[in-house]
A protein has these predicted regions:
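Solvent-exposed edge beta-strands and adjacent loop segments
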Residues: 2-78, 117-135
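Extracellular/virion structural assembly segments
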Residues: 55-118, 132-135, 145-154
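Acidic-aromatic/histidine active-site loop/patch
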Residues: 138
């Protein structure tokens, strides 16, 4: 018997950020609004070849480290209009280095009981285009340390 799966939608994700605070978890996070495209965080493994002559023709790999990245695109307000506070945290971190370029983040799907939290190095780049294109920016958050589970308050 086939089971029907009702798919989720990418717009179920919510991203919240906070300026980096020397590793101390902030008490206040700011939601990033205007997201039009989002790739949630997912661990990827660094694999190293650990095969030897005894394995014959078969190779073997083992994971030696984990990393993660998330990215997205946001609509950017016109000049002179109010900026989105969450986007502003990403923009300021995106033009800074070392600790000033880090942000705390939380990412969770609507209706989910757990999400992700961590610290990431941020990039934020406004895009160009033709005269009729909307102003958008791309952001990337590259993980620094553990991608931890996050349980939101009920």
């Amino acid at each position: 018997m086939a089971t029907t799966i009702t798919p989720g939608i990418v717009s179920d994700w919510t991203l919240e950020v906070a300026a980096y605070t020397d590793g101390t978890t902030p008490t206040t996070f700011t939601r990033v609004y205007g997201i039009t495209d989002f790739t949630p965080p997912a661990p990827s493994k660094n694999l190293e070849d650990d095969s030897d002559f005894d394995s014959g023709a078969w190779g073997s790999q083992t994971g030696t480290g984990l990393s993660y990245e998330m990215s997205g695109t946001v609509k950017v307000p016109r000049a002179g209009l109010a900026v989105d506070p969450g986007q502003e945290i990403l923009r300021l971190a995106g033009k800074s280095v070392a600790e000033d370029g880090y942000v705390h983040f939380r990412a969770i799907k609507k209706g989910a009981t757990t999400g992700y939290t961590g610290i990431a190095d941020a990039s934020f780049t406004e895009g160009g285009g033709s005269r009729t294109d909307l102003t958008k920016a791309e952001f990337t958050l590259s993980g620094r340390g553990e991608l931890a589970d996050y349980t939101p308050a009920p």
